[in-house]
From Swiss-Prot:
Species whose genome carries this gene: Neisseria meningitidis serogroup B (strain ATCC BAA-335 / MC58)
Compartments (UniProt record): Cytoplasm
Record function comment: Nucleoside triphosphate pyrophosphatase that hydrolyzes dTTP and UTP. May have a dual role in cell division arrest and in preventing the incorporation of modified nucleotides into cellular nucleic acids.
Family in the record: Belongs to the Maf family. YhdE subfamily.
Annotated protein name in UniProt: dTTP/UTP pyrophosphatase
Residues at the site labelled Important for substrate specificity: R12, T77, Q159
GO biological process terms, semicolon-separated: nucleotide metabolic process
Domain of life, source organism: Bacteria
Active site: D76
Species classification: Bacteria, Pseudomonadati, Pseudomonadota, Betaproteobacteria, Neisseriales
GO cellular component: cytoplasm
Length: 202
């Protein structure tokens, strides 16, 4: 079975890679996720993925005394509405604020992926556009009370209850979840790593 290191605690990214047939070893890497003054959402999300990768790689080398044998993947996702980055809500009140901002409008979801393998590092940002239906205060309140928004960028989960708010998606469903499958596998292959299909050959 093909093996990957995932520099993340995200159960959603873990699920995506596992469903592709990879054996995944998690190497969580905590970093400062503050936005720099004047930083664009695109630059921010790419910097986050790259910093997570460097941090996870350093921790691996310090712990094991060697470089990883398998690709190390990190990613970061941000929701952008009217040019403003909506991260993970810090309170129920902020989750309500985010959902009111997204209600009845189009927003952008950016997911950056960074992969290190055999001394080479590649990063890419994938862009998605999502349209929310108009949300009532009752819908927002009930959703926030469910607890689902509290650890999600933009205060919603496309693969969960939050999916009922979405009228349309332009882009990648897996990218909105947190790890775009097409881009990730393409990057792995460009770096010389095996396709998930290679494990299925008789």
């Amino acid at each position: 079975m093909n093996t990957l290191y995932l520099g993340s605690n995200s159960p959603r990214r873990m699920e995506i890679l596992t469903q592709l047939g990879y054996r995944v070893i998690q190497l969580p890497a905590g970093i400062d996720e503050s936005v720099k003054a004047g930083e664009t959402p695109f630059a921010y999300v790419q910097r986050m993925a790259e910093e997570k990768n460097r941090t996870a790689l350093t921790l691996f080398c310090e712990t094991n005394g060697t470089m990883p044998d398998f690709p190390l993947i990190t990613a970061d996702t941000c929701v952008v509405s009217d040019g403003i980055i909506l991260g993970k809500p810090r309170s129920q009140a902020e989750a309500i604020e985010f959902l009111n901002r997204l209600s009845g409008k189009q927003h952008t979801v950016l997911t950056a992926v960074c992969i290190h393998y055999r001394g080479k590092t590649s990063s890419r940002v994938q862009t998605n556009r999502v349209v929310f239906k108009p949300l009532s205060s009752e819908e927002i309140s009930a959703y926030v009370q469910s607890g689902e928004p509290m650890d999600k960028a933009g205060a919603y989960a496309v693969q969960g209850i939050g999916g009922i708010f979405i009228q349309s998606i332009e882009g990648s469903f897996s990218g909105i979840m947190g790890l775009p499958v097409y881009e990730t596998v393409s990057m792995l292959q460009d770096l010389g790593y095996r396709s998930p299909l290679s494990a299925l050959k008789p």
